[in-house]
Amino acid sequence: MADPAVGAPAGMLIELTHRCPLHCPYCSNPLELVRREAELTCEQWTDILTQARELGVVQMHFSGGEPLARPDLPDLVGHARRLGAYVNLVTSGVGLTAERAHDLARRGVDHVQLSLQDADPAAGQAIAGARVHTAKLEAARAVTAAGLPLTVNIVLHRGNIDRTGRMVDLAVDLGADRIELANTQYYGWGLRNRAALMPTAAQLAAAREAVRHARTRYAGGPELVYVAADYYDDRPKPCMDGWGSTQLTVTPAGDVLPCPAAYAITTLPVENALRRPLSEIWYASRSFNAYRGTGWMREPCRTCPERHADHGGCRCQAFQLTGDAAATDPACGLSPHRSLVDAALAEVTDGPVPAFVPRGPVPA
């Protein structure tokens, strides 16, 4: 049953494809990727974008995988612009030439988020699994030359976190208007590589100090956002600002999710935009209503004074670690399952770091 208190979604993450030129070990896409032949057609995506705008979506985030792998990306961007949506492109930058950047700006892209693996070219390419560092720098310059605002997204992990300050410096040099430093979120392939990616407490402390210095050094410059490592905190992150409250995700095959990692919760039914209207999925589906509000909560969340701020933490993380999506997020110090997180932290030492398993390509 639909909750009459639920408002319209503000944003939609549009995962056009799982195909990607990179092989990052912290990839948050599902372990089982959507094959090219199972991807939605341009016509199907056009209909979904139209439905989303009618539903109330005002921000459309084109992502993947790598959205530039879709030759119909410019047409879909143009359709989103004609619908009146704010268009954001989330990209690795591989293949984003000056010509393509100008064309996408002309078609309707309002903003670009570009991933950067490291300030050190060799280290960054080792994580990306491809020789792409120079291409990324050229893509960043193409974005700013096209007159588009640029956000540089940097995922922090054990292998690059000691260069936090250098990565901020590089992003500033590239003309970034916004820099997001996000500690690795352990979903999908990232959870598989957790032991190799988890930084030490000392590394995190040094990174926070580097961010503090950068904010002082670049005061009045680009916005600098730091996303904390929730495993080391005693309170969970307010994931998605609440389940099914402001955002939805559509996968390459048309599955509609309350958050990008909700594929991990195998106990929930999977809704698909080819089988049910987007408005019905948002307002009336069991998957979207399962963890809205606070009625689903158990103790200690049910009576916690922070329940309206942190929403009980991340449902996907709770399921992946406990097998119960309604459990208190184990990252919370009050969770009866906090020992699961503490055990993972206990494995992080100053000794040898296990090798990570690179993300494989979409099967042919």
UniProtKB/Swiss-Prot annotation:
**Its annotated pathway?**
Cofactor biosynthesis; pyrroloquinoline quinone biosynthesis
Which species expresses this protein natively?
Streptomyces rochei (Streptomyces parvullus)
Enzyme Commission code(s) on record? 1.21.98.4
The job of this chain, per UniProt, is described as: Catalyzes the cross-linking of a glutamate residue and a tyrosine residue in the PqqA protein as part of the biosynthesis of pyrroloquinoline quinone (PQQ).
Judged by the first EC level, this protein's enzyme class is oxidoreductase
- Protein's UniProt name: PqqA peptide cyclase
Gene Ontology molecular function terms on file: 4 iron, 4 sulfur cluster binding; cyclase activity; iron ion binding; oxidoreductase activity; S-adenosyl-L-methionine binding
Keyword list (alphabetical) reads: 4Fe-4S, Iron, Iron-sulfur, Metal-binding, Oxidoreductase, Plasmid, PQQ biosynthesis, S-adenosyl-L-methionine
UniProt remark on cofactor binding = Binds 1 [4Fe-4S] cluster. The cluster is coordinated with 3 cysteines and an exchangeable S-adenosyl-L-methionine.
Q: Which reaction does it catalyse?
A: [PQQ precursor protein] + S-adenosyl-L-methionine = E-Y cross-linked-[PQQ precursor protein] + 5'-deoxyadenosine + L-methionine + H(+)
